[in-house]
């Protein structure tokens, strides 16, 4: 059995609401200032197939709760609520239409933007296609060039292989020659070892000879006077420039003096020109500083028919009847070149070229 369900909607309205309702009903707003609470019934649609008569009865029962208020008051309160619902629906419809219009505008703008973007992308794709075509053509040309180069490289490789084969053959020939050279080298090394041993033996002999030579030089040093290694004179001889001079302490005739100088591997000294400020003059003063006045020495200049020096130089002069030989004579402090009988006995001066110290 279906039971009747009563819905009661109770709303507590504050003072401002009461004043607004009273103003609408044309009542005094201060009529309800006694603190009474006003109950308002709201019209609701039927729920779950409840008939409108039942809803009306429910509302009627709710209206009976406040028996003190008249029926006119109830109707006046109910009518404005229903009037407020209708403008709300109209406003919602307007907002809905406005939203639909804005949505359509957005869709239109979106479609335009998509179209423009489509055109841009299409142009970019066309440009990309042209670039790809150019690139493809370039790649084809490069590919053909690479194929040509590979063919050339293959030919070069074949040529290199042939050259490698020839080089290998030449290398084998060189290896055989190298082996032969190694054999010769080993033989040379054996000879070198023998030569080295011989050289060591010769070196030992050379050292022994050098030692003997050093000992001999030490023994010979007292017999030689050396200004340097290339200018040496026998002991007792006087060195002047690159010549050695020997002044005898004994007297002999000219011929014996010449022979005595020859036994000493020398010859009689020659002084071609003797005059003050001449080289020979100064040399005689340095050679015979202690020579007193009247001292004479045989020299190599003899006066036969022709004045012939012992060094084979010629000087033509008138000769005397008897054989005369040259001598150097000191008178006081002057040296002169004079003639003397070759048989006279005088000291003599021998001259020889300075020599290198014996190695």
From Swiss-Prot:
UniProt entry tagged with the keyword Chloroplast: no
Keywords: Disulfide bond, Glycoprotein, Lectin, Membrane, Phosphoprotein, Receptor, Signal-anchor, Transmembrane, Transmembrane helix
Glycan attachment residues as annotated in the record: 136
One GO term of the biological process aspect: negative regulation of B cell receptor signaling pathway
Gene Ontology MF term list: carbohydrate binding; signaling receptor binding; transmembrane signaling receptor activity
Residues that span the membrane, as ranges: 96-116
A Pfam family it matches: Lectin_C
Domain of life where this protein originates: Eukaryota
InterPro entries referenced in this protein's UniProt entry, alphabetically: C-type_lectin-like (IPR001304), C-type_lectin-like/link_sf (IPR016186), CD72 (IPR039689), CTDL_fold (IPR016187)
Keyword Aminoacyl-tRNA synthetase: no
Tissue: Pre-B-cells and B-cells but not terminally differentiated plasma cells.
Disulfide-bond pairs as recorded: 233-244, 261-350, 325-342
GO cellular component: plasma membrane
Protein name: B-cell differentiation antigen CD72
Species in which this protein is naturally found: Homo sapiens (Human)
UniProt lineage: Eukaryota, Metazoa, Chordata, Craniata, Vertebrata
